[in-house]
């Protein structure tokens, strides 16, 4: 696959979405927001931060063979596998990332 490093990772944390309950579903429709996906993003961020705090590396994968994962782990059809968070000890140091400056991505009191 696209992420050959994942084959050697000792831990895969799958994030599986369940259908929201009635109240959450209606709230999401009214507000035009997908609250379960927001919650999943928050949880994934905290998982990776916790891994880093323990000296582990992590990688959040959204592109994987969901059908194969679902079959392998007997995940019901009514649930969606949203993310695979791979956790393990890094074999290489983290490469320096090219990032935009703070001024390019942060604004105060206006967009």
Roles of regions detected by a PLM:
Residues 68-82:
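Short, electropositive alpha-helical surface patch
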Residues 47:
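Aromatic/hydrophobic pocket-lining residues that form π-stacking "cages" and hydrophobic walls in ligand
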């Amino acid at each position: 696959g696209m992420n050959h490093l994942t084959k050697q990772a000792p831990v895969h944390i799958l994030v599986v979405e369940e259908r929201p309950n009635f109240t959450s579903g209606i709230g999401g429709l009214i507000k035009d927001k997908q609250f379960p996906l927001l919650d999943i993003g928050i949880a994934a961020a905290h998982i990776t931060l916790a891994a880093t705090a323990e000296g582990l590396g992590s990688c959040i994968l959204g592109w994987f063979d969901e059908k194969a994962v679902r079959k392998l782990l007997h995940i019901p059809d009514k649930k969606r596998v949203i993310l695979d968070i791979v956790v393990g000890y890094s074999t290489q140091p983290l490469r320096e990332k090219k990032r935009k400056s703070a001024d390019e991505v942060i604004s105060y009191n206006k967009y």
